[in-house]
């Protein structure tokens, strides 16, 4: 994977909005790396309590098997379908961890309690100021998916899904970071599949989106365009 663009897109009135564009380059290697990353459950060992380790192990093993099977099926057929949003989500998560040095928290589906329907945000991290970032990933086969990601993120905020997610993420973040979430000190990352549209045009369209002003009012807003 290669970060091809990293730009600050808005700093008016203290705003902190960023745009990254990631090119997976060799998709075969990228998919193999994603499967390896998902299969690495060493993060479970950080928890002192045996019952927590057992809980996360049980949740993660079945989910990893399911996701990896979807990715492998997509790689074999060239049609990624259900696997595509997992790919966008994991590429974005790894980019924030490796490029920005943000907190390495496993993909949400590996540790969150499974809920019917859409359970909430897809991935989580915190920045160097210990502010929790809630991540949403969207894939569309025919067009850039930033609009769908912004719309869903705005809806999740309105429905207080970020607050609801605190119960699932509390063991990965500090008390002060979680208190900040409740008090409004938090950020959002929107990862989306990108086509051949230039980054300049993507940024212009993102800033014109009806949800942009509200989303940019939070402590940090990050867009991660994934060329897939």
Annotated model-derived regions:
Residues 137-197:
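Catalytic cores of nucleic-acid endonucleases
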Residues 98, 129, 140-143:
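Short loop/turn segments at secondary-structure transitions that flank enzyme active sites
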Residues 125-134:
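Active-site beta-strand-loop-beta-strand hairpin of nuclease catalytic cores
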Residues 119-121:
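Short beta-strand or tight-loop elements
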Residues 95-116:
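A short acidic/basic microdomain associated with nuclease active sites
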Residues 1, 79, 99, 153-158, ...:
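Charged, terminal alpha-helix-loop-beta segments
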Residues 1-90:
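Interdomain/boundary linker segments immediately adjacent to catalytic/signaling cores
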Residues 172-228:
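Domain-level recognition of nuclease-like catalytic cores that cleave nucleotide substrates
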């Amino acid at each position: 994977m290669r970060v091809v663009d990293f730009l600050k897109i808005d700093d008016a009135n203290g705003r902190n909005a960023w745009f990254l564009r990631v090119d997976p380059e060799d998709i075969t290697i990228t998919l193999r790396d994603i499967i390896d990353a998902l299969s690495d459950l060493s993060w479970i060992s950080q928890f002192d309590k045996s019952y927590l380790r057992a809980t996360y192990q049980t949740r993660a093993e079945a989910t990893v098997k399911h996701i990896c099977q979807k990715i492998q099926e997509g790689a074999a057929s060239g049609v990624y379908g259900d696997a595509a949003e997992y790919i966008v989500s994991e590429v974005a998560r790894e980019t924030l961890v490796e490029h920005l040095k943000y907190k390495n928290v496993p993909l949400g589906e590996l540790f969150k309690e499974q809920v019917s329907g859409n359970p909430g945000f897809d991935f989580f991290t915190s920045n160097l100021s210990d502010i929790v970032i809630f991540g949403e990933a969207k894939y569309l086969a025919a067009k850039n998916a930033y609009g769908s990601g912004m719309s869903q993120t705005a809806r999740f905020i309105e429905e207080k899904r970020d607050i609801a997610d605190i119960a699932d993420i509390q063991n990965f973040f500090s008390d002060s970071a979680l208190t900040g979430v409740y008090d409004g000190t938090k950020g959002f990352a929107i990862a989306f599949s990108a086509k051949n549209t230039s980054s300049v045009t993507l940024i212009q369209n993102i800033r014109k989106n009806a949800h942009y002003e509200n989303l940019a009012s939070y402590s940090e807003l990050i867009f991660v365009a994934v060329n897939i």
